[in-house]
């Protein structure tokens, strides 16, 4: 058969350059500088929140986990846009009971759950 050749230029198929999207996930993680660096400006940060209470920080650190407050602090320091808290201790029967604690530090904190989803939107390019 016939073969047609046509050169396509990037401007014909690409939009204006824009910042990409980032999702940062880490489980079984205590706060550390590397995690903060990786989470910088994340569109969605998904964090360990095994322990609920601030007085459990030493226990969390000992076992390589985080508290709700520590994860919220990390999200704030990293300038993340959203935070989903996950990996709850079996002792936490209703994570929503502790959500306000995290939201007082980082208002965009939410409790994650199986099947939770989100559609992240690109930011429009600035002229």
Region spans (language model):
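Short, surface-exposed amphipathic charged segments that create phosphate/polyanion-binding patches used
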Residues: 121-127
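Short, small-residue-biased leader/transition segments that mark boundaries at the very start
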Residues: 1-4
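Cap/insert and terminal regions of metallo-dependent hydrolase folds
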Residues: 7-117
């Amino acid at each position: 058969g016939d073969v047609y050749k046509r050169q396509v230029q990037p401007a014909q198929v690409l939009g204006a350059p824009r910042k990409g999207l980032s999702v940062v996930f880490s489980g079984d993680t205590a706060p550390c500088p590397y995690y903060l660096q990786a989470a910088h400006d994340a569109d969605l940060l998904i964090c360990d929140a095994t322990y609920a209470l601030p007085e459990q920080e030493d226990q969390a650190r000992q076992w390589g986990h985080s508290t709700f407050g520590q994860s919220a602090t990390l999200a704030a320091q990293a300038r993340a846009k959203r935070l989903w808290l996950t990996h709850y201790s079996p002792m936490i029967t209703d994570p929503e009971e502790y959500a306000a604690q995290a939201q007082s530090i980082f208002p965009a904190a939410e409790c994650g759950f199986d099947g939770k989803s989100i559609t992240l939107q690109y930011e429009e390019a600035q002229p």
